[in-house]
């Protein structure tokens, strides 16, 4: 959003944003913010988006999600005065499925890793057995558009001390995953398709692309990600893969291609027909991709696109943002601890010689309580 405001044409931009969470931090950067519906059908979401744009007289809609619901409605949005920034519906439909993405990309000559689609325990075990024959570690993830939360590295090895001292990894055993699939089938639980493939553990390369309708790439900026650091890469081989994929799918405006290396060669990890969440990092290259995309959508001209400054290294840091509303975290109420039981001494005997006996009894009791505390 900052890149849109800091545009080279000095256009005063007013930003409207929606999120399913009322207190989403991103909404604090918007001039107008509203809550959007959660868990609704594509048709209902599209109706919400159209009504929002009509009510607020939105000039340009840049959807970061629910693209399948919106991609085929370019004319509907135009009817309410809004230009929709989106790639063709056919491309969006394919790219929201990782398995279909790999199939079509491989046909286009884009290098992809070996993969198998599974949805049951037997197919999963067969896929692991086949793909692990190369000696590579294997992983599993949902085959749909968003897979980060379902990603697991398969590991049947014993836990070692060095594992306990290292940052945690999303590990799961083959047996545990197979049991989960079998249990879901026995309980008639809906099972999505999963992708089984080699685990590519090198630095991820993300290529942010700007392209004209029809898929002609106008700019492609590659950056590697390792921890909190990013490198703006000057590597034509990486951007060439992204250009080929963007051209084959005829992607328009903003898209993102993610690569990793396997055996020293770059292969496709995934592709998204939308801007990446990290596109703001490309600002340090000197190219304002989001604003160029808006210009391209509105006027058909992306404007001057300087050669990106590559080779730089940057760090992604955190900032604290105040948000409105929300419910404070409640302290867990715990019952008051019960008082320790009081031991009552026998009635004090005042007879001669009773004092030493009472002292000995008290010492025994005190010794008993001390032992309990220890």
Name what the model sees in each region.
Residues 147-148, 223-231, 272-286:
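Glycine-rich phosphate/pyrophosphate-binding beta-alpha loops
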Residues 236-262, 274-324:
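Active-site "cap" helix and flanking loop/linker of ATP-utilizing ligase/carboxylase catalytic domains
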Residues 1-90, 371-372:
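ATP-binding N-terminal substructure of ATP-dependent carboxylate-amine bond-forming enzymes
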Residues 94-193:
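Active-site nucleotide/adenylate-binding loops and adjacent lid/helix of ATP-dependent enzymes
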Residues 262, 292-374:
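Peripheral (often C-terminal) accessory segments that flank ATP-dependent C-N-forming ligase machineries
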Residues 164-245, 249, 260-261, 265-267:
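Phosphate-binding site of ATP-dependent enzymes
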């Amino acid at each position: 959003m900052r890149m849109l405001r800091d545009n080279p044409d000095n256009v005063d931009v007013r930003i409207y944003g929606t999120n399913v969470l009322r207190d989403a931090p991103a909404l604090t950067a918007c001039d107008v913010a509203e809550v959007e519906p959660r868990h609704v059908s594509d048709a209902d979401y599209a109706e919400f988006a159209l009504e929002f744009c009509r009510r607020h007289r939105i000039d340009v809609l840049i959807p970061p999600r629910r693209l399948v619901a919106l991609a085929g409605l370019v004319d509907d949005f135009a009817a309410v005065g809004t230009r929709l920034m989106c790639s063709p519906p056919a491309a969006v439909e394919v790219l929201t499925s990782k398995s279909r993405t790999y199939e079509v990309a491989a046909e286009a000559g884009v290098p992809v890793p070996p993969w198998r689609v599974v949805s049951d325990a037997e197919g999963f075990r067969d896929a692991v057995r086949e793909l692990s024959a190369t000696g590579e570690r294997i992983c599993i993830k949902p085959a749909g558009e968003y897979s980060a939360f379902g990603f697991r590295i398969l590991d049947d090895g014993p836990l070692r001390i060095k594992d306990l001292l290292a940052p945690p990894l999303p590990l799961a055993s083959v047996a545990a995953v197979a049991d989960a699939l079998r249990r879901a089938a026995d309980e008639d639980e809906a099972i999505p398709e999963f992708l089984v493939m080699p685990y590519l553990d090198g630095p991820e390369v993300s290529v942010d692309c700007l392209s004209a309708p029809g898929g002609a790439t106008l700019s492609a900026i590659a950056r590697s990600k390792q921890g909190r650091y990013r490198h703006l890469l000057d590597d034509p081989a990486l951007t060439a893969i992204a250009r080929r994929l963007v051209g084959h799918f005829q992607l328009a405006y903003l898209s993102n291609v993610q690569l990793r290396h396997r055996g020293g060669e770059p292969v496709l990890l995934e592709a998204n027909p939308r801007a990446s969440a990290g596109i703001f990092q490309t600002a340090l290259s000197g190219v304002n991709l989001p604003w160029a995309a808006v210009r391209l959508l509105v006027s058909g001209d992306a404007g001057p696109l300087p050669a990106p400054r590559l080779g730089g290294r940057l760090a992604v840091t955190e900032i604290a943002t105040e948000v409105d509303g929300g419910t404070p975290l409640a302290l867990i109420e715990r019952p008051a601890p019960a008082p320790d039981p009081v031991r009552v001494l026998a009635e004090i005997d005042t007879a001669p010689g009773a004092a030493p006996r009472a002292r000995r009894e008290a010492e025994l009791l005190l010794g008993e309580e001390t032992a309990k505390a220890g």
